[in-house]
Swiss-Prot record:
Superkingdom in the source lineage: Bacteria
InterPro entries per record: Integrase-like_N, TACO1_YebC-like_2nd/3rd_dom, TACO1_YebC_N, Transcrip_reg_TACO1-like, Transcrip_reg_TACO1-like_dom3, YebC-like
GO cellular component: cytosol
Keywords: Cytoplasm, DNA-binding, Transcription, Transcription regulation
The name this protein goes by in its record: Probable transcriptional regulatory protein CJJ81176_1187
Family: Belongs to the TACO1 family.
Taxonomic placement: Bacteria, Pseudomonadati, Campylobacterota, Epsilonproteobacteria, Campylobacterales
Compartments reported by the entry: Cytoplasm
C-alpha cells in the first residue's frame, strides 16, 4: 500500500489494544522462519528479522524462545504460507498473506470477510502485475548522514531509502533480503519491522468516504488470527 495510507493505518492500529492478536501472529512468523531456515538466528536472516520485529513490539523473550522451540519439536504444527488476492469496495486491490495450519478454515474465513464487506476474492495471479515484491525494512529514525548511509547500502541491494517524521524505510528487491538485513545490522540501525512486502506499482487515491468503506474490510482481515499482512494499492 502507499506510504501515506500505510502511516495512517499504523497510527490507527497504535490506538487499538491488539496485543492479544499481535503476539500470536509474531510467534507464528518466528516459528515458520525457524522451521524453514533453521533455529540459529545467526544463520537465518528471516528468523533474525522476525525476532527483531517481535522485540520491537515488546514481545516477551519467553514467548520468542517458545516459538523457536516449537519449530524444532516433533509435534510442531505444519503451518503453511497462504496467499490470497481480491478487490475491496470501490475497486481497491488487496493482497492477503496468511500463515495457517488449516488452509480450509482460512480460505473460508477470508472469502467470508471479503463477501460480507463489499469485496470479492480473485483468482491468484490476477494482481501479480499490479504489485512488486520488495524486501522492506522499517527502522528507527537515523540521525546521521542519509546520503552516506545510502551509498553504504547500495552494494547490499538497496533500491530506495526514505525517512519521514516517524521512521526510516529501506527497500530493495526481494532477493536481497538477506544481504540488506546483514548490512543493516552491521550499521547498527534499530529495526522495527522487516519482511517481504507487496508494493503497488500504480497507487490509487480514494476519497475519505471511500477509504472508510475499504477500511471496514481491511480491519476485519487484520483481525483474523491467520492473517499476517494485508497490502493494497491505496496511495
Amino acid at each position: 500500500m502507499g506510504r501515506a495510507f500505510e502511516y495512517r493505518r499504523a497510527s490507527k492500529e497504535a490506538r487499538w489494544d491488539k496485543m492479544s492478536k499481535l503476539f500470536p501472529k509474531l510467534a507464528k512468523a518466528i516459528q515458520v522462519a525457524a522451521k524453514e531456515g533453521g533455529t540459529d538466528p545467526d544463520m537465518n536472516p528471516k528468523l533474525r528479522s522476525a525476532i527483531a520485529t517481535a522485540k520491537a513490539n515488546n514481545m516477551p523473550k519467553d514467548n520468542i524462545d517458545a516459538a523457536i522451540k516449537r519449530a524444532s519439536g516433533k509435534d510442531s504444527a505444519d503451518i503453511k504460507n497462504i496467499h490470497y488476492e481480491g478487490k475491496a469496495a470501490h475497486g481497491a486491490l488487496v493482497i492477503v498473506e496468511c500463515m495457517s495450519d488449516n488452509p480450509t478454515r482460512t480460505v473460508a474465513n477470508v472469502k467470508a470477510i471479503f463477501s460480507k464487506n463489499g469485496g470479492e476474492v480473485l483468482q491468484n495471479g490476477s494482481l501479480g502485475f499490479m504489485f512488486t515484491r520488495k524486501a522492506v525494512f522499517h527502522l528507527e529514525k537515523f540521525a546521521g548522514d542519509l546520503e552516506e548511509l545510502e551509498l553504504d547500502l547500495i552494494d547490499a541491494g538497496l533500491e530506495e531509502l526514505e525517512q519521514n517524521e516517524e521512521e526510516l524505510v529501506i527497500s530493495g528487491d526481494y532477493t536481497a533480503f538477506g544481504e540488506l538485513s546483514s548490512a543493516i545490522e552491521t550499521k547498527g540501525l534499530v529495526l522495527k519491522k522487516a519482511g517481504l512486502e507487496y508494493i503497488p506499482n500504480n497507487p490509487v487515491s480514494f476519497s475519505e468516504e471511500q477509504l472508510s468503506d475499504i477500511e471496514k474490510l481491511l480491519d476485519k482481515l487484520e483481525d483474523d488470527d491467520d492473517v499476517q499482512a494485508v497490502y493494497t494499492n491505496i496511495d
